[in-house]
Amino acid sequence: LPCFKCKSCREGNYATCENYDYYGSRRDGGMTEYIAVKRWNLVKMPSGLSYDEGAMCEPVSVARHAVGKLNISKGESVFISGAGPIGLIAGQWAVLLGAKKVYYTDIDKRKLEFAKTLGFYEWENGTVTDCALEGTGYSNALQKCLETVKPHGRMVLMGNPAGEVTMSQNTYWQILRKELCINGTWNSSYNDVINDWHESIKAMADGELNVKPLITHKFPLSECNTAFKMMKNKTEFYNKVILNMQGAD
């Protein structure tokens, strides 16, 4: 919900709006069965695309926006810290854009095993990559990215930190001595020229991007508290949890 008035909005960069709002985050309504929104906020789902896939459009768009900033060339290798839903979707986008291998690190070994079932690789000590995507917002993950990427490599910071992020002198040196190019990323692009949402819907509809394996759990809305409790207490492994307004399949 951009303001359409600030400099960023006038340039079509709505994600960096100075006054933007958000359904389900800054504004209530994102988890209601029905919500009235302006037509501008809608993305038409093509026939053949399931509601589950449609529900994944937002993380797919965020991942596309981030990976696009890596400027991946055919045959390059990519390192991603964080094997959560957006991180794994980012890996798929990286492959679509030409990456030969995508490596992951994560503190949860189950996530790494899950990533390997999707055709990705667990990062091993000493592996150097052409570019890196930081997807956790933690200091040690940032350091690992800087250590892993090659000299003159590219790096994108995507992880939203829950606390302070610190950097040691040695970590800072990695940026200087490798002459790294580092970009930030926030949300997605959705203007008339670049629209990550439209491209994401198209990629899923065309079968280029498969998000179905990432959906590990589905709950009816009436059991949302059960879903939240499972996620909070981590009583079982999950990747992406869907609340189905029509009842879980």
Residue ranges and their predicted role:
Residues 75, 128-130, 211, 224:
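Local beta-strand N-terminus motif with an aromatic residue
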Residues 121-125, 218-223:
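Short acidic-hydrophobic, aromatic-tinged amphipathic segments that line or gate anion-handling sites
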Residues 70, 112-180:
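Glycine-rich cofactor phosphate-binding loops and adjacent beta1-alpha1 units
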Residues 165-215, 225-226:
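C-terminal substrate-binding/catalytic core of Rossmann-like NAD(P)-dependent dehydrogenases/reductases
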Residues 3-81:
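NAD(P)H dinucleotide-binding glycine-rich loop of Rossmann-like/cofactor-binding domains
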Residues 3, 32, 42, 60-63, ...:
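A general structural signal for well-ordered alpha-helical segments in protein cores
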Residues 49-125:
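Mid-domain Rossmann-like dinucleotide-binding core that forms the NAD(H)/NADP(H) cofactor-binding site
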